[in-house]
Amino acid sequence: MKLFRKIQKWFENQENLYYLFLIILIVPNIVLCFTEPMPLVAKVCNVLLPFSIYHMIMSWSGNCGKTFWILFPFLFFGAFQIVLLYLFGQSVIAVDMFLNLVTTNPGEALELLDNLIPAIIIVVLLYIPALVLAAVAVSKKRRLSETFVRRERKRARITVIAGILSLVAAYLFDARYELKSDLYPANVCYNIALAFQRTAQTQHYAETSKDFTFQAKTTRPEKNREVYVMVIGETSRAANWSIYGYNRNTNPELTKIKGLTAFSHVLTESNTTHKSVPMLMSSVTAHDFNSIYRQKGIITAFKEAGYRTAFFSNQRYNHSFIDFFGKEADICDFIKEDTGDGSYNPSDDELLKLVAAELAENASKQFIVLHTYGSHFNYRERYPADNAFFLPDFPVDAELKYKDNLINAYDNSIRYTDNFLARLIRMLQEQDIDAAMLYTSDHGEDIFDDDRHLFLHASPVPSYYQIHVPFLVWMSDNYRKNYPDFLKNAEINRQKNISSSASFFQTMLELGGIDTPSRNDSLSVINASYTEKNRVYLNDHNEARSLDDIGMREEDFTMLQTKGIVYR
């Protein structure tokens, strides 16, 4: 009882709470010093300047509980930041993280939530008791002494001056230092503003893009029946495809298919679905991503050229460009939305049924876009249980101790994709027409691959495993006969350095014989004039940055070199 009274007395002391609240406010900044690859001067600034501002604000009122509650938005940011650091290991809350709150469907969020329980427990223990203590201080009108408040205000002024000097030093000694990117929580506030701006631009997309036209036309004879299928995979990384040298047989069917070219050195320019897929479906790249608000997608190009178009997706609406571009098609079906059941989780097989029905229409010119669910976590749900080849594939909780199970389940999902694509190719081949298929994945995935123990994707700083993706071109017998140079050029280019984000759209236009001012054959992997470009990545602020300027670690560059991928 004596100890309890001492503890109670300590927490009732408002001066103790004042310092406790200050420490809690600055915890995320201290943690970021250990996770972010910043020079020492930047780390000092990242703690000293925010601490001085918190100190100044806390000294405004004699009731520290009231001030602590006024700072609640920053406590929320801190909690969010700690959870993200637990999940990704580094970086501040990105613009994409805020946008994901809108674009990620509840099913995906629930799949992940169970695996964040340790981080959530940490956040609850750190913030909830402090907020309760602050609420008690407010309700009981407990106040700091005037002497204490005056003293702390003087100290706060001194720390603010020191903080400003540390900011000046950061700019002087670190050429890459940016307040909007490197100073927490200023960077988070900037990112929130950007998220609101992008949300507003997205909401006005119909108006800003209404006059856009590709001025597209076909260069192919009208009498020839043609079918082109563009397949956008999900979370499939090239490192686990045996067609690229993986030591497990994850591609037993594709390796036997005639007319298939697999491109080895392909990187995506984004590790997020809501950015990567729109780049695959349009002419925008990391260099001009913000022009997307004024453009339309590849489906419109094929429609303008006289094609019957279809878009079939095994994902839910994301209320953004994937939806906009998909709905350009004559036939559009997001199959997860068909039942009204939020738990409906069909396999990608359902997409093949829709393809079969579309082919049965026997239109002269057909263009079909498929957006699969591929290898998205939870991996074990991406393939039928009786198709499990690598075992055990359960349990697959997001914990390091289950790494082998996770890899087994993930590899099973790759084998399922292999079977899916092989069946699609056979369907097209059986049509005995000019047909071609183009496949890539939006991004890859981390599965506790190295000492960093990273998991999933969409981290503000990507890893090698998140950006190296498969890229396939298949051409039917008839197509290869009529356009032999395309296969020859594909074989010549298959070991070259390629950006899926820049080349997918352009390659599809050339495969389909679509002529438009938006076409750039130097980016088409089936063109003799294909030209390798410097690698770039679309950062959180929609800027094209080189891979050595986005925070990637030595482990990532080592893997890129091991795979023979030029990253500059």
Language model: regions and residue ranges:
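Active-site-proximal alpha/beta segments of enzymes that process anionic O-linked groups
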Residues: 161-230, 235-397, 500-501, 506-531
